[in-house]
Amino acid sequence: MGIGKSKINSCPLSLSWGKRHSVDTSPGYHESDSKKSEDLSLCNVAEHSNTTEGPTGKQEGAQSVEEMFEEEAEEEVFLKFVILHAEDDTDEALRVQNLLQDDFGIKPGIIFAEMPCGRQHLQNLDDAVNGSAWTILLLTENFLRDTWCNFQFYTSLMNSVNRQHKYNSVIPMRPLNNPLPRERTPFALQTINALEEESRGFPTQVERIFQESVYKTQQTIWKETRNMVQRQFIA
């Protein structure tokens, strides 16, 4: 499955997730949700400028932009995790999401198919990875068949290498259903200890990986980065 053929609603992460935690496949879902979501993506700041600056001058426009940022900041959420998965594994990804949130209290989290529509795949992936503390790669038989999934995991790994605070943030996971055998796992992922849901030590693995202190550190850096961009834009 190439990028242009993906049926997953893979569009950029809006980071305003307080009102929804499940996939809705109704016809009007993406249209209504995209109107509610307000994205402060670094690539999207210029668009806000065009819609907020009125004809009365730069000063009034700057004030409007500042007010807009303050309102949106109240709704922004830095996610605990995002699950990247193959198109055919949406149900399994939802099950894992609920497992982590309900059984282990690791929330909020999201799966790739839940993201609101409106952006291209690359922007969507960038927002998802950088808008969450951990990136979970759902290793199933379908994962290797999906070209887009292969691109996702390579991009996620490079991001974790190039950004110090993202070190060890990529978590391969073999779920209970249709897991990818170790011997067929890409070499780049074999070097990382994967979460094994069928293992007796799975609960211990989860507690060791998803530490609140790590989340808080990444959340602070995320907020500082966004605030810096907002100040530069307003100035």
Curated annotation (Swiss-Prot):
The lineage of its organism: Eukaryota, Metazoa, Chordata, Craniata, Vertebrata. GO terms for molecular function: molecular adaptor activity; signaling adaptor activity. Signal peptide: none annotated. Changing residue 6 to A: Loss of phosphorylation. Significant reduction in the ability to activate IRF3 or NF-kappa-B. Homodimer. Interacts with TLR4, TICAM1, IRF3 and IRF7 in response to LPS. Interacts with IL1R1, IL1RAP, IRAK2, IRAK3 and TRAF6. Interacts with protein kinase-inactive mutants of IRAK1 and IRAK4. Isoform 1 interacts with isoform 2; the interaction occurs in late endosomes and disrupts the interaction between isoform 1 and TICAM1. Interacts with MYD88; the interaction decreases after IL-18 stimulation in a time-dependent manner. Interacts with IL18R1 and IL18RAP. Interacts with TLR2. Interacts with RAB11FIP2. Changing residue 16 to A: Loss of phosphorylation. Abolishes ability to activate IRF3 or NF-kappa-B and to transduce TLR4 signal. Changing residue 2 to A: Results in relocalization from membrane to cytosol; Loss of ability to transduce TLR4-signal. Loss of TLR2-mediated activation of IRF7. The gene is TICAM2. This is TIR domain-containing adapter molecule 2. The TIR domain mediates the interaction with TRAF6 and MYD88. Functions as a sorting adapter in different signaling pathways to facilitate downstream signaling leading to type I interferon induction. In TLR4 signaling, physically bridges TLR4 and TICAM1 and functionally transmits signal to TICAM1 in early endosomes after endocytosis of TLR4. In TLR2 signaling, physically bridges TLR2 and MYD88 and is required for the TLR2-dependent movement of MYD88 to endosomes following ligand engagement. Involved in IL-18 signaling and is proposed to function as a sorting adapter for MYD88 in IL-18 signaling during adaptive immune response. It comes from the Eukaryota.
